[in-house]
Amino acid sequence: MTHIPKRTLVTTALPYANGPVHLGHLAGVYLPADIYVRYKRLCGHDVIHIGGSDEHGVPITITADKEGISPQEVVDRYHTMNAEAFAKCGISFDYYGRTSGPVHHQTAREFFLEIEKKGIFVKKTEKQFFDPKAGRFLSDRYITGTCPVCKTPGANGDQCEQCGTHLSPTELIDPKSKLSDATPELRETLHWYFPLGRYQKQLEAFVERHTGDWRSNVVNYSRTWLNQGLADRAITRDLAWGISLPLDSEEAKGKVLYVWFDAVLGYISFTKEWAEKQGDAELWRRYWQDPETRIINFIGKDNVVFHTLMFPAILMAWNEGRSEGRYELADNVPASEFMNFEGRKFSKSRNYAVYLGEFLERFPADTLRYSIAMNYPENKDTDFSWSDFQNRTNGELADTLGNFIKRSIDFTNSRFGGQVPADIDLEAWDSLGIDWLASFGKLEAAYDGFHFREATAQTMEIARFANRFLTESEPWKVIKVDPEAAGRTMAVSLNLCHTLALLFWPIVPETANRIWKMLGFEGTIDELVEPGNPVWRQALEPGLKKGHKLLGSSEILFSKIEDKDIEPEMKKIEALLAEAEQREAAKQPVPMTFKPEITFDDFQKIDLRVAKVVACEPVKKANKLLKLQLQVGSEQRQVLSGIAQYFTPEQMVGKNVVLVANLADRTMRGELSQGMILTVEGADGRLFLLEPQGEGINGNSVS
């Protein structure tokens, strides 16, 4: 017999508070977790659903720098935005926390100090880029330069967006600091490392213990890392935004916890905050430190090793040498594959996405929940398309479920006074043609095995059966010759409505509650579910007795989606795909068309010199022009250049440029220009400077 734990803790990967969540996030993590939690609640289980925002890390500080605001303002904005979008979508968190909060900071520091006290961390000195102007060390994403592979300028220190190559900052050609545009210097810095290899054997045993119940992708990702051997992993960074190290030593100054270490601890700190709101500050321990709790971590496949290796290793380090206050490890880590969008991967950086909040401004949440549940990326990547969304809403939700519910209630209201016209005994219920015990057994197995697409499809199949039953029974005809038979048909139909309301509640909760209300019940299904009350089993049997009074009115559960409703979205896709094609074309070699041939003597007439920009200012009433004061050896020149759209005056000062020194003077916008500086035009039309490097080259010839 399967052991049923006393309680279940469900956590969801923390979305990064640096932008809005999109449908890919919803499909991979938050909707499946919510469906599972709602199912468990229906079964009467003690289950809590914990989520929240990951609010630390470099991308947040970069966004803050770009917008001229504080990191706290960035995370405040996106935490609120995402929390509201989740609530509107019916994602039923028991608590949605923030890693920037005091309880989380305290929890993360407690873990650090406990592991530090045991002497587990390893300290290492390494070389890292340092911005001499800004006076701070730079993380990968604060460094930009030319990609060594495709030679595209503007590559980040961790990856080139143009060719996709993963990089380290030291590989960049001509690296620059994004903070000051200064050339960074390699300097030594000290960091704390977590020795993952110390727990290699324990982690191998942990993964192997779950090979029979974890998804194959989770096991395979974990084994790949284990087979390579687990290395030490840095847990600190030189950064101003984050959780500062709780040490007074000089070497700890300016260090914060690396986000991979602190974010997963949010599951624990958020459970603590939830417990405080329940009036019992120690209640969280029952969900984290009791073997009678089953812990489920819902994540996407890109987060697997953080939850199967790194987070467990942190908990193992805490537990080491302890007999009390030991943390339990996850029972399952149902990691999904990715959901793509119209054949391509979701991409925030390229704005190729459908954001949850924006979607819900146009379409009901339940239509999205159903469409994604039927396309859940369990074992392979799936694709969200507007046409599939339209077809499922119209053909399955509106024409099948919605049609059956409305016909059943409308006919009862009009011909039977809005009351259930007959009692349905179990014999009649079981003779409908559905093996209820077998059907429920399959549904329970699907939910318990995290097969949400299968569970959704089976539930819709019961709706199809109900719709066929009503259509084939033709009570609108039978009532003319046998009112009692028509009454029995409607009693069966109404009880099927009752069953469907309960079965669909995990998938489309708002719709289920609307059906519940039309059936004449007070309150909502949400108010029925509580530990120890197995509402789920009520769907097995007829739940409406003869004489039960319906609400007396019905409503259309789902409006059909017309072509004109999704046409604007399709046009957006066309525009985004056109942009993508342009980017792809930019990667291809540019066809060369050369100017007419000149002789070597002609070329020798051009005098190219290295000049340094000593001052720069905009040209009045000229949006494209900058006025540069150049030092060319012992001479000073004034040059006007059409680069104002790509460089600020502040960025230009101090740069070396290539000057055409013997170009005839000319006047532009009333200003004298004594030459021209050389630039290169990129595929997107952006201009890049030619910047000679080296000491003592000012005024020298370029050849």
UniProtKB/Swiss-Prot annotation:
Known role = Is required not only for elongation of protein synthesis but also for the initiation of all mRNA translation through initiator tRNA(fMet) aminoacylation.
Organism, by scientific name, is Chlorobaculum tepidum (strain ATCC 49652 / DSM 12025 / NBRC 103806 / TLS) (Chlorobium tepidum)
Q: How does it assemble?
A: Homodimer.
Which cofactors must be present for this protein to function? Zn(2+)
Subcellular location(s) of the protein: Cytoplasm
Report any one BP term from Gene Ontology: methionyl-tRNA aminoacylation
Question: Which reactions is this enzyme annotated as catalysing?
Answer: tRNA(Met) + L-methionine + ATP = L-methionyl-tRNA(Met) + AMP + diphosphate
What top-level branch of life does the organism fall under? Bacteria
User: Which residues does Zn(2+) bind?
Assistant: C147, C150, C160, C163
A GO cellular component annotation in the UniProt record: cytosol
Q: Where is this motif: 'HIGH' region?
A: 15-25
Residues the entry annotates as binding ATP: K348
The protein, known as: Methionine--tRNA ligase
The alphabetized UniProt keywords are: Aminoacyl-tRNA synthetase, ATP-binding, Cytoplasm, Ligase, Metal-binding, Nucleotide-binding, Protein biosynthesis, RNA-binding, tRNA-binding, Zinc
Gene of origin?
A: metG
What protein family is recorded?
Belongs to the class-I aminoacyl-tRNA synthetase family. MetG type 1 subfamily.
State the span of motif ('KMSKS' region). Answer: 345-349
Q: Which Pfam families does the annotation name?
A: Anticodon_3 (PF19303), tRNA-synt_1g (PF09334), tRNA_bind (PF01588)
Q: What is its EC number?
A: 6.1.1.10
Q: Which GO molecular-function terms appear in the entry?
A: ATP binding; metal ion binding; methionine-tRNA ligase activity; tRNA binding
Boundaries of every tRNA-binding domain copy: 602-703
Note on cofactor: Binds 1 zinc ion per subunit.
